[in-house]
């Protein structure tokens, strides 16, 4: 039986501080210096042809169900290959499954998964569509930390940041023809914003219990962090239930669920 989802594909890059442009220029200088040294020493080099636009690029595919969400992330980072002065790709492929039942973190490259990873891919987790999550200040872990006078100020700062990140800016934009609501993201590196659409037959809500924004992410912009923009968005699309449980594939090792991870 298929599962009804909203599916968005986003592409972007890490701006960073120093900026992507500055760090890319620094890498080019390091490559040129490496080539010069190796050629003078008579060593073999592999000259770089086309250069990437971004030092760290990312692609995300997010599938929103009515009671769960899974995000597939691929990150490609370019570094100097000391063997021949070429560029080397460091690629990570991960997925995180989240619902009211807990979180499962999946490393697609090493075929490992940890956390709350039931075989049904959180299909039986309680639905909380269109419901605002519990206030962050109700978190028991924070309450315990706040009892320590040395941590009280830090906890208050965390609560203030999270509370402000839950506030909409009141602005609206259009991405891929879909109207979305802009939310401030002060906790993002350097601050930022995210735009969520509430279009479709259901409105997915953030299910971590740490945020009130609802909808499908179409745009995320952080001053020093990642800048992601939707390149494809499909509402009310039917997919296989296997999308929510990649760790059920042969060869995966799933760790025992820890109570603290639920």
Language-model segments: residues:
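Extended soluble regions of mature proteins
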Residues: 1-262
């Amino acid at each position: 039986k298929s599962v009804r989802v909203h599916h968005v594909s986003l592409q972007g890059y890490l701006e960073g501080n120093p900026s992507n442009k500055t760090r890319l220029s620094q890498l080019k200088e390091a490559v040129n210096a490496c080539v010069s040294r190796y050629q003078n020493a008579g060593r073999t080099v592999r000259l770089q042809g086309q250069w990437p636009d971004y030092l760290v690029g990312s692609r995300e595919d997010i599938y929103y169900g009515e009671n769960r969400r899974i995000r597939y992330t691929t990150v490609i980072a370019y570094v100097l290959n000391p063997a021949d002065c070429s560029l080397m790709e460091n690629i990570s492929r991960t997925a995180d499954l989240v619902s009211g039942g807990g979180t499962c973190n999946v490393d697609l490259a090493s075929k490992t998964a940890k956390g709350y990873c039931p075989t049904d891919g959180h299909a039986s987790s309680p639905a909380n569509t269109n419901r605002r999550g519990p206030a962050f200040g109700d978190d028991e872990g924070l309450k315990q930390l706040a009892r320590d006078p040395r941590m009280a100020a830090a906890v208050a700062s965390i609560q203030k940041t999270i509370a402000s990140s839950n506030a909409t800016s009141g602005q609206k934009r259009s991405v891929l023809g879909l109207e979305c609501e802009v939310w401030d993201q002060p906790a993002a590196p350097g601050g930022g914003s995210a735009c969520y659409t509430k279009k479709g037959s259901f409105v997915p809500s953030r299910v971590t219990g740490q945020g009130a924004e609802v909808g499908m992410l179409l745009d995320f912009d952080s001053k020093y962090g990642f800048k992601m923009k939707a390149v494809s968005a499909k509402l009310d699309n039917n997919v296989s239930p296997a999308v929510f449980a990649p760790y059920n594939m042969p060869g995966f090792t799933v760790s025992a669920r820890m109570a603290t991870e639920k």
